[in-house]
C-alpha cells in the first residue's frame, strides 16, 4: 500500500540534498558516499557520489511535437545499440517530455522493463496498433481529424470558449470594480456637494474633511518618525518596507479626503460667518489676503507647520546631536510644512475653481490627489535640502525612495482614473458610426503603414544585423499594439460598468430611491449597488471556477495523455508488487488493454499516478529503466532574488519520488494532490510543456502577461507550496481570485502558499541543469529546439546557469562543426564538452543538434525532399503543433539518421559486436572519434 499522505505531509519539506540522496539509493541500490567514504550530506558530496558511481543521463529538449518527433528517432537509434537501458536518468523538458513520459509509462507497464521497450523500439517490423502506429495516427494530437467541420476542431473551439467565459466571471467583475473605484470617490464628493445646499454646512464638511486629512498626515508622519528612529538598529529591510506601506496608505487617504474638502470649499460661497472668521484671522495675521480663494491655501499652510515641525524635531541622525541643530531642523520642518501646505491649497483650489474654466469633477478627481502627493514629495525634497548638513547618504537614499513611491502612486491613480473616467467616452467616440468607423480604419491604416515603413527602412550597420534590427522594430510595434489593445480592453470593461451604472440609476429613479447628485447622472448609492453585485459575482465565481481545470491546461493535457501515454497501453503481465487499489484509483487497469470511451476516445486509465513509477516497489525486481525527471519552471516574475530579475524562474521537477524545487524543498510524489489521488504523470508532462503562459520566466512582460491571462491562454498549473502541508495535499486552489490576479499582474513568487509552474523551457530548455545537479559522469543532450539562426541560446543559457548556481564549468572539448545547410557535406551533428565538477572530476557531455546538410552521405531521400519544401526545417516554429504525416516522419527519420551518423564506421576492439558500444561512456568516446575525422 502507498504511504499515508497525511502522515507524510505533516513533516517539513525535504531539502535538495535529502531528495537527491533518496534518488541515489533508488537508482544505484547503494548508499551515497562522499570523497572520504563518509555518507554524503550536501549536494556537492552527492555529485561526487554520483560521479564515482558512473551515473549517466539522457536529456531530451523542449520544442513541442517537433522535438518529440526528432527525439523519438534518436531514442530508436539508441535502442538499436542497446544503450537506452544503460542510462541512469532521463531528464526531459516540454516536447522531449512527451517522448520521455511515453518511455517512462511504457517501461512501467512492460514486464521486462527497459529491455522489452528497447527491443520494441529497435524492431523495424511494423504492426497495427503498436506504439509507433498509434503515434502516427495521433500526430495531430490536439485535433487528430482535420477539417473545418471536424468535431475535434470544434471541440477545441467549444472548450476554449467555455473556459474563457468562466474565467471572465472572475476578471470582468474584478476590472469593473477597479474601474468603479474612481467613480465612487467622485460620486461621494458630488453627492455631498449636492446634499449640503447651505454654505455653512458645506464649509463645515470641508473643514471636517481637512481635519481628517490632517489627522491622516499626522499618522503618516508619526509612523515616519518611528521608522527613522528605529532605522539604524534594523538588520533587515522588511519592517521598514512594511512601515513605508502604512505611510503610503495614510498619505493616499489624506490625498483623497483633502481633495474632496477643497472641492467642497470651492463651492461654498463666502457668507457672514466665513467673513467674520476670516476677519478674526486677519487681526492675528494681518498679511492674510482679502481674496477668499487665496485664504484657504494660506490657512492650510499654517496647519501644516505643526506636523512638519514635529517631524523636524523627531528627526534622528548621527550628525544631529547639538540642541541648536535640532531646533534648526524643527524650524526647517515648519517652513517646509508651510510651503507644502500652501502649495497643496493653491493647486487644489485652482483645480476646483468655479470660474469659466472650471474642470469637470472627473478631471478634478484625476488631478487633485496626485497633486497632493506631488506637493508632499516636494516637501520631502525641500526638507532633505534643509537638513542636508546633518543627514547621511543613507538618509538621502531613504528620502529618494520615498519620493519614488509617491511618484508611482500618482501614476497609478492617474492611470486608473484615465481608464475609468475617460476610457468609456473615448470608446464611444471610436465605435460611433459617424466618427468611429473612419477613425478606426485611419488608425489601423496608419499603424500598418508606419510599421511597414519602419521594417523596410530600418538601416542596420551591417547585413548580419539586419534580421535582428527588424526583429527589434517588430517587437516594439507589437508592444505598442499590445498597449493599445490593453487600454481598449480595460476601457471596454469600464464602459460596461458605466452602462450598468446608468441602468441602476434609471431603476433607482423608478423606485424612488434617489440620492442627491450635482454634476453626475448617478449617485454613490448606484455605484455601491453595482459594486456589491459585482463583488457577489466575483466571490461566487472565485469559489466555483477552478483556476486550474478551466484554463487550457486540461484540454492540452488530456490530448497529450491520449497520444503519448495511451500509446503504451496493451495487455501486460501483472507486476510482482502490491497494486494500489485505493479508490478512486485502480493500478491494475494500467496493465489491461486500452478501453477508450466511444464518443470522446479518451481512457481515464491512460494516465498513471506519478508515484507508481518509483523504482524498487518490490524487492528483487530489476530497475524499470532510466529514472524519469520531468523538468518545469517555477515562475518568479515578482520574486525577491534581485539576481534573478532576468531569469524570473527557478527549476521545478517532477519525479516518481519527489516534487519540488531546490530553493523551496521537496515533497514526496505521494503527498502532492494526495486528496485527489496523487499527481499524475500526465499532469507533470503537460506542465513541463506549458509553453503558452502569461508568466513565462524570462519571456514575461507586463502587457503580454495581462493580455494572455485575459484571453485565458494559460497552460500552466498552480501547485501547493512544499512548505505548506495542507495545500500540498490539494489539487487546486480553493479560491481562484488570487491566483488569477497573480497571473494577470505578473505577481508570481516563491512566498505565497500557491506556486505557478509552467514550461521547463521558461527556465532551462535542455534538461541539462538537473542532470548536472545530479553529478552525472556522461551526459547525452538531444537539442531539437527552434534555432533557425543557430544562436544556440538554450545551450548557452544552460551552461551559464549551471556555472552560476552549481559552480560546475562546461567547456568545449573538440571541434565545433554544427551549422546550417551552407556547410553542405562538412557539417557535424554533435559536439563534445567537458563537464568540470572539480579539479579531480571531469565528465563528458555529448551535444546532439538537429541539422540538415544536403550533401552529407546517406541522408534519407525523403528527409531531403521535405527539407526542400521547408526552408526552416529542422527548425520550424514551435507554434506549428498540427503536424502532418510527412512532417512527423521527416523529423523522426532525421533523429534516427543523426544517431547512426554519429557512430557509423567506428569499431571498438574486443567486443562480440564491434559496432555496438558496451556503455554510454563508449558511445561518447565513439562520437569523439568521429568528430576528429
Model-derived segments and spans:
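Catalytic domains of lipid- and phosphate-ester/thioester hydrolases
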Residues: 1-933
Amino acid at each position: 500500500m502507498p504511504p499515508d499522505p497525511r502522515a507524510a505531509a505533516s513533516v517539513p519539506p525535504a531539502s535538495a540534498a535529502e531528495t537527491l540522496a533518496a534518488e541515489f539509493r533508488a537508482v544505484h541500490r547503494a548508499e551515497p558516499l562522499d570523497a572520504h567514504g563518509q555518507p554524503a550530506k550536501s549536494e556537492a558530496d552527492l555529485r561526487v557520489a554520483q560521479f564515482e558511481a558512473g551515473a549517466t543521463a539522457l536529456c531530451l529538449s523542449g520544442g513541442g511535437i517537433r522535438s518529440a518527433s526528432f527525439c523519438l528517432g534518436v531514442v530508436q537509434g539508441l535502442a538499436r545499440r542497446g544503450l537506452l537501458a544503460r542510462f541512469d536518468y532521463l531528464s526531459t523538458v516540454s516536447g522531449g517530455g512527451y517522448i520521455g513520459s511515453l518511455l517512462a509509462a511504457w517501461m512501467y507497464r512492460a514486464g521486462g522493463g527497459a529491455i522489452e521497450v528497447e527491443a520494441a523500439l529497435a524492431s523495424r517490423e511494423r504492426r497495427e496498433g503498436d506504439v509507433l502506429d498509434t503515434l502516427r495516427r495521433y500526430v495531430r494530437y490536439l485535433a487528430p481529424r482535420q477539417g473545418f467541420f471536424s468535431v475535434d476542431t470544434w471541440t477545441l473551439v467549444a472548450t476554449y470558449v467555455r473556459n474563457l467565459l468562466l474565467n471572465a466571471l472572475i476578471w470582468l467583475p474584478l476590472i469593473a470594480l477597479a474601474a468603479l473605484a474612481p467613480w465612487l470617490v467622485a460620486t461621494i464628493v458630488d453627492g455631498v456637494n449636492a446634499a449640503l445646499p447651505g454654505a455653512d454646512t458645506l464649509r463645515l464638511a470641508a473643514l471636517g474633511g481637512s481635519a481628517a486629512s490632517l489627522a491622516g498626515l499626522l499618522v503618516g508622519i508619526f509612523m515616519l518618525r518611528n521608522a527613522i528612529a528605529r532605522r539604524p538598529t534594523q538588520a533587515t529591510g522588511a519592517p521598514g518596507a512594511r512601515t513605508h506601506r502604512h505611510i503610503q496608505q495614510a498619505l493616499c487617504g489624506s490625498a483623497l479626503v483633502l481633495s474632496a474638502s477643497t472641492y467642497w470649499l470651492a463651492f461654498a460661497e463666502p457668507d457672514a460667518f466665513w467673513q467674520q472668521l476670516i476677519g478674526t484671522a486677519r487681526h492675528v495675521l494681518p498679511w492674510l489676503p482679502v481674496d477668499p480663494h487665496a485664504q484657504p491655501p494660506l490657512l492650510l499652510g499654517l496647519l501644516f507647520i505643526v506636523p512638519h515641525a514635529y517631524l523636524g524635531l523627531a528627526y534622528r541622525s548621527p550628525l544631529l546631536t547639538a540642541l541648536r541643530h535640532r531646533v534648526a531642523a524643527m524650524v526647517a520642518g515648519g517652513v517646509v510644512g508651510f510651503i507644502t501646505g500652501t502649495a497643496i491649497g493653491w493647486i487644489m483650489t485652482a483645480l476646483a475653481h468655479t470660474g469659466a474654466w472650471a474642470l469637470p469633477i472627473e478631471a478634478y478627481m484625476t488631478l487633485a490627489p496626485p497633486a497632493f502627493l506631488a506637493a508632499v514629495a516636494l516637501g520631502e525634497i525641500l526638507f532633505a535640502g534643509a537638513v542636508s548638513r546633518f543627514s547621511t547618504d543613507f538618509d538621502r537614499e531613504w528620502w529618494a525612495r520615498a519620493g519614488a513611491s509617491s511618484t508611482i502612486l500618482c501614476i497609478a491613480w492617474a492611470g486608473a482614473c484615465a481608464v475609468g473616467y475617460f476610457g468609456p467616452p473615448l470608446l464611444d467616440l471610436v465605435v460611433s458610426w459617424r466618427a468611429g468607423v473612419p477613425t478606426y480604419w485611419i488608425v489601423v491604416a496608419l499603424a500598418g503603414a508606419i510599421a511597414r515603413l519602419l521594417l523596410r527602412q530600418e538601416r542596420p550597420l551591417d547585413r548580419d544585423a539586419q534580421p535582428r534590427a527588424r526583429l527589434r522594430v517588430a517587437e516594439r510595434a507589437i508592444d505598442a499594439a499590445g498597449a493599445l489593445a490593453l487600454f481598449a480592453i480595460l476601457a471596454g470593461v469600464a464602459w460596461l460598468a458605466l452602462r450598468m451604472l446608468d441602468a441602476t440609476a434609471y431603476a433607482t429613479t423608478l423606485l424612488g430611491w434617489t440620492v442627491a447628485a450635482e454634476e453626475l447622472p448617478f449617485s454613490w448609492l448606484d455605484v455601491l449597488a453595482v459594486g456589491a453585485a459585482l463583488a457577489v459575482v466575483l466571490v461566487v465565481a472565485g469559489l466555483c471556477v477552478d483556476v486550474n481545470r478551466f484554463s487550457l491546461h486540461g484540454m492540452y493535457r488530456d490530448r497529450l495523455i491520449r497520444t503519448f501515454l495511451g500509446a503504451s497501453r496493451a495487455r501486460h503481465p501483472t507486476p510482482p508488487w502490491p497494486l494500489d487499489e485505493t479508490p478512486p484509483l485502480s493500478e491494475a487497469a494500467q496493465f489491461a488493454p486500452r478501453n477508450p470511451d466511444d464518443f470522446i476516445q479518451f481512457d481515464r486509465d491512460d494516465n498513471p499516478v506519478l508515484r507508481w513509477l518509483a523504482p524498487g516497489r518490490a524487492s528483487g525486481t530489476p530497475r524499470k529503466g532510466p529514472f524519469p525527471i520531468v523538468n518545469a519552471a517555477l515562475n518568479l516574475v515578482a520574486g525577491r532574488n534581485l539576481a534573478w530579475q532576468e531569469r524570473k524562474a527557478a527549476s521545478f521537477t517532477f519525479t516518481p519520488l519527489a516534487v519540488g524545487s531546490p530553493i523551496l524543498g521537496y515533497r514526496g510524489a505521494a503527498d502532492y494532490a494526495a486528496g485527489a489521488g496523487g499527481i499524475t504523470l500526465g499532469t507533470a508532462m503537460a506542465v513541463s510543456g506549458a509553453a503558452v503562459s502569461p508568466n513565462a520566466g524570462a519571456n514575461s512582460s507586463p502587457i503580454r502577461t495581462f493580455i494572455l491571462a485575459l484571453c485565458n491562454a494559460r497552460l500552466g498549473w498552480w501547485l501547493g507550496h512544499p512548505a505548506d502541508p495542507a495545500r500540498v495535499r490539494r489539487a487546486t486552489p480553493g479560491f481562484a481570485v488570487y491566483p488569477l490576479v497573480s497571473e494577470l499582474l505578473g505577481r508570481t513568487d516563491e512566498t505565497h502558499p500557491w506556486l505557478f509552474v509552467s514550461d521547463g523551457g521558461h527556465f532551462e530548455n535542455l534538461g541539462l541543469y538537473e542532470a548536472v545537479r545530479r553529478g552525472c559522469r556522461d551526459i547525452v543532450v538531444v537539442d531539437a529546439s527552434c534555432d533557425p539562426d543557430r544562436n544556440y541560446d538554450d545551450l548557452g543559457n544552460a551552461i551559464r546557469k549551471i556555472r552560476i548556481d552549481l559552480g560546475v564549468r562546461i567547456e568545449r572539448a573538440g571541434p565545433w562543426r554544427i551549422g546550417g545547410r551552407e556547410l553542405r557535406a562538412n557539417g557535424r551533428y554533435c559536439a563534445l564538452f567537458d563537464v568540470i565538477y572539480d579539479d579531480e572530476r571531469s565528465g563528458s557531455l555529448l551535444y546532439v543538434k538537429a541539422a540538415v546538410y544536403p550533401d552529407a552521405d546517406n541522408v534519407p531521400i525523403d528527409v531531403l525532399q521535405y527539407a526542400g519544401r521547408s526552408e526552416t526545417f529542422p527548425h520550424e516554429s514551435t507554434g506549428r503543433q498540427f503536424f502532418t504525416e510527412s512532417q512527423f516522419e521527416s523529423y523522426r527519420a532525421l533523429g534516427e539518421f543523426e544517431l547512426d551518423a554519429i557512430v557509423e564506421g567506428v569499431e571498438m576492439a574486443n567486443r562480440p559486436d564491434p559496432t555496438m558500444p558496451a556503455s554510454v561512456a563508449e558511445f561518447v568516446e565513439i562520437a569523439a572519434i568521429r568528430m576528429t575525422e
